Swiss-Prot record:
Cellular compartment(s): Cell inner membrane
Keyword presence, Cell inner membrane: yes
UniProt entry tagged with the keyword Transcription regulation: no
Subunit structure: F-type ATPases have 2 components, CF(1) - the catalytic core - and CF(0) - the membrane proton channel. CF(1) has five subunits: alpha(3), beta(3), gamma(1), delta(1), epsilon(1). CF(0) has three main subunits: a(1), b(2) and c(9-12). The alpha and beta chains form an alternating ring which encloses part of the gamma chain. CF(1) is attached to CF(0) by a central stalk formed by the gamma and epsilon chains, while a peripheral stalk is formed by the delta and b chains.
InterPro entries (alphabetical): AAA+_ATPase, ATP-synt_VA_C, ATP_synth_F1_bsu, ATPase_a/bsu_AS, ATPase_alpha/beta_chains, ATPase_F1/V1/A1_a/bsu_N, ATPase_F1/V1/A1_a/bsu_N_sf, ATPase_F1/V1/A1_a/bsu_nucl-bd
EC number: 7.1.2.2
Membrane topology: Peripheral membrane protein
Family to which this protein belongs: Belongs to the ATPase alpha/beta chains family.
Catalysed reaction equations from the record: ATP + H2O + 4 H(+)(in) = ADP + phosphate + 5 H(+)(out)
HAMAP family the record matches: ATP_synth_beta_bact
Function: Produces ATP from ADP in the presence of a proton gradient across the membrane. The catalytic sites are hosted primarily by the beta subunits.
Major enzyme class: translocase
Protein name: ATP synthase subunit beta
């Protein structure tokens, strides 16, 4: 393979000069001689010089060092040997459990499946979380986004979904930690270990303290491992926490690569980078990838270019709201803002659809009446509106639920509620069967029977 020389180092971006007749291709991996450091070629600048991003810290790099062209993109181990292991962006183990003797390695840059290979699915994926199953149901092989500002519970929701689906679903999962807290990665590992599902999960981490090159590519590393499981004919779950940090890593290197920034300082290639990742997360005729992605919303502004670009790719959006978190209702899902393509009578059935829409109508009416209540008080409302308000407040509380992964903090055991029980409970509240129960009985319970039992103790 050809040898090049480092000619310039600016932060994470390194320029390497090669002989004119053997210039590396874009996306090829270069390896620093006598070191583990890997670079990925981003641009060819002419005169044999290529501009690269370092997949590791560039501390101590200097001009004149030699780098060799591997002749192929970054290759990572795939297959069953990756299960139960924690890896970095290059597929190297970071859990001190010995090498990963994978039979196969795949390049992290791949083409998305063609039109002929793709397959749609109408099958629902039950999560055991009432508000999600009722109002924004997930499709098997679909893409879901968890949107929320700082501290409204994206990661806790994500961990609960993983726990519920991984245990109930019994397939393989891949978790890509993109620019998140190392503590969360550690908690997550132990959570999986304690739930005895670690041997079904591959973990790929590029945490907050990593250089931008790692955070920019770690999502692709996780996705490549998921694609391998899918191409073996499995239904695989892909969790990405957090898509926003993927965009942010692109912002960090974009200016260093010499690109002009676009709106709000984002990279001009934002839509393309997002599309290249998202289009590969899809189901084929051999197997499916169901993906659940956490999306940080800067300053709670859903119109920011990063979350706005992500919206276009998703089948279901779960919006976590600060106003609902302030009421102490967790999961803090906004029932009026969250949407799903699956909420269609032809897919979920008429009964489920009607219940979900009536829940939303009741909550919407309550929202409209709030101003009147604030100024004139409840007594000025008509009897019909009073009923709507009391039922809406019960629905609001019944949408909360204790989580398994939060047991250590809350002290109350987690609850998994089947879709059948969820629909039955909300139908009962809407029909007025539980008008005599106090609001507090509906707060942080699983099924409606628990609410009835709780009312007796109040």
């Amino acid at each position: 393979m050809s040898l090049g020389t480092v000619v310039e180092v600016i932060g994470a971006v390194v320029d390497v000069e090669f002989p004119r007749d053997s210039v590396p291709k874009v996306n090829d991996a270069l390896k620093l001689v006598d070191s583990d450091l890997v670079f990925e070629v981003q641009q060819q600048l002419g005169d044999g010089v290529v501009r690269t991003i370092a997949m590791g810290t560039t501390d101590g790099l200097k001009r004149g060092l030699k780098a060799e062209n591997t002749g192929h993109p970054i290759q990572v181990p795939v297959g069953k040997k990756t299960l139960g292991r924690i890896m970095d962006v290059l597929g190297r183990p970071v859990d001190d459990a010995g090498p990963i003797d994978a039979e196969e390695t795949w390049a992290i840059h791949r083409k998305a499946p063609s039109y002929e290979e793709q397959a749609g699915s109408q099958e629902l994926l039950e999560t055991g979380i009432k508000v999600i199953d009722l109002l924004c149901p997930f499709a098997k092989g679909g893409k879901v986004g968890l949107f929320g500002g700082a501290g409204v519970g994206k990661t806790v929701n994500m961990m609960e979904l993983i726990r519920n689906i991984a245990i109930e679903h019994s397939g393989y999962s891949v978790f890509a930690g993109v620019g998140e807290r190392t503590r969360e990665g550690n908690d997550f590992y132990h959570e999986m270990k304690d739930s005895n599902v670690l041997d079904k999960v591959s973990l790929v981490y590029g945490q907050m303290n990593e250089p931008p090159g790692n955070r920019l590519r770690v999502a692709l590393t996780g996705l490549t491992m998921a694609e391998k499981f899918r191409d073996e004919g499995r239904d695989v779950l892909l969790f990405i926490d957090n898509i926003y940090r993927y965009t942010l890593a692109g912002v960090e290197v974009s200016a260093l690569l010499g690109r002009m920034p676009s709106a709000v300082g984002y990279q001009p290639t934002l839509a393309e980078e997002m599309g290249m990742l998202q289009e590969r997360i899809t189901s084929t005729k051999t197997g499916s990838i169901t993906s659940i992605q956490a999306v940080y919303v800067p300053a709670d502004d859903l119109t920011d270019p990063s979350p706005a670009t992500t919206f276009a790719h998703l089948d279901a959006t779960v919006v976590l709201s600060r106003q609902i978190a302030e009421l102490g209702i967790y999961p803090a899902v906004d029932p009026l803002d969250s949407t799903s393509r699956q909420l269609d009578p032809l897919i979920v059935g008429q009964e489920h659809y009607d219940t979900a829409r009536r829940v939303q109508q009741t909550l919407q009416r309550y929202k409209e009446l709030k101003d009147i209540i604030a100024i004139l008080g409840m007594d000025e409302l008509s009897e019909e509106d009073k009923r709507v308000v009391t039922r809406a407040r019960k629905i609001q509380r019944f949408l909360s639920q204790p989580f398994f992964v939060a047991e250590v903090f809350t002290g109350s055991p987690g609850k998994y509620v089947s879709l059948k029980d969820t629909i039955k409970g909300f139908q009962g509240i809407l029909a007025g069967e539980y008008d005599d129960l106090p609001e507090q009985a509906f707060y942080m319970v699983g099924s409606i029977e628990e609410a009835v039992a709780k009312a007796k103790t109040l």
